[in-house]
Amino acid sequence: MPVTLKDIAERANVTSATVSMVINNKPHISEETREKVLAIAQELNYYPNAIARGLATRKANAIGVIVPNLASSYVVRILQGIKSTNRDIDYTVQLFDTIGQKETETQLFQRLARERRIDGAILIGSVVSEKELKVFRDESVPCIVVARKCDILDSVFVNNTQGSIEATDYLIKLKKGNIACAVCYKKNLPMEERLEGYKLSLKRHGVSFDENLIFEVSDDTMAEGEALFSKIIESPTKPSAVFVPAGDMVAIGIIKMAKRTDMRVPDDFAVVGYDDLPAAEVIEPALTTVRQPKLEMGDHAINLIIDKIEGRETAFKHKELLTKFIVRDSA
């Protein structure tokens, strides 16, 4: 027997009219009531039939932007690109922070899509695997992945491999000896591509790859870089330079610790980062780094998702942007 509004109302201890208002995304309903009604509707399997059919033609005039960490400077710059687009848009941009939890990311998108609270979604730095991203493809709401290439969804990304090749080439040409590489152990495609670029550069220059020169951090923070510095310096491989695909904040932490130990950067120890965050220019010495076109990524993403929503772009589209190697004083 089909589930009715009355069934949901009785379980939620509200009126059928209230349930109808929630399902149709009407205002003047408390968030607590809305969440309770929607949870019961989902529990009773109401979404796949009545809600989906009833709301299929309704627009929310909203674009959901799902991020893994709203405190990240990298994410903030992409968001600035989304917000500063030259295009006049009739959509509200809604931000959702999943704090890097892939289950939350998937469940959040499903809920927003099925409740028709968004017309499209932008995933920035998604931690979900390609297999799991099928969930996003199977919903009726268009979705774009930013900062990583994705074969099953539209994506806007940078050529991470080439960026790492340029950075490693530069350090090799400085004849700095062993070059350490600091990566983030949170395995994802961009980080794997950056590590691959490091390896390719070594190979092209006839330098053997040494696993002992790979160091891992848990996140792109200054504290992680400070903690990593002693591990690099005390390593039997004795590196005299480090390339930091993990990000600029780790590189800055390394520079700070080097200065505290009276090690001269870049004379005694060269440091190259990845991202070109605003802090890269402020640190002394200023950080040599790989610049990612974060504003451009955001701008391309918002324009592409609008074209998808409004039916102007139907084919899969993958936009690759190039990095730029920025030489400053740390290497």
Question: What does each model-found stretch correspond to?
Answer:
Residues 1-61, 74:
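N-terminal helix-turn-helix DNA-binding module of bacterial transcription factors
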Residues 18-21, 55-71, 81, 170, ...:
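Short beta-strand segments enriched in small/hydrophobic residues
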Residues 62-169, 173, 234, 238:
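Alpha-helical recognition/docking segments in bacterial nutrient-uptake
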Residues 68-77, 95-104, 156-166, 182-230, ...:
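Hinge/beta->alpha junction and helix N-cap segments in small-molecule ligand-binding domains
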Residues 88-89, 202-209, 235-237, 260-265:
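Short helix-capping segments at alpha-helix termini
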Residues 177-178, 209-213, 265-270:
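Short acidic capping loops at alpha-helix termini that bridge into adjacent secondary structure
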Residues 230-331:
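Flexible loop/turn connectors
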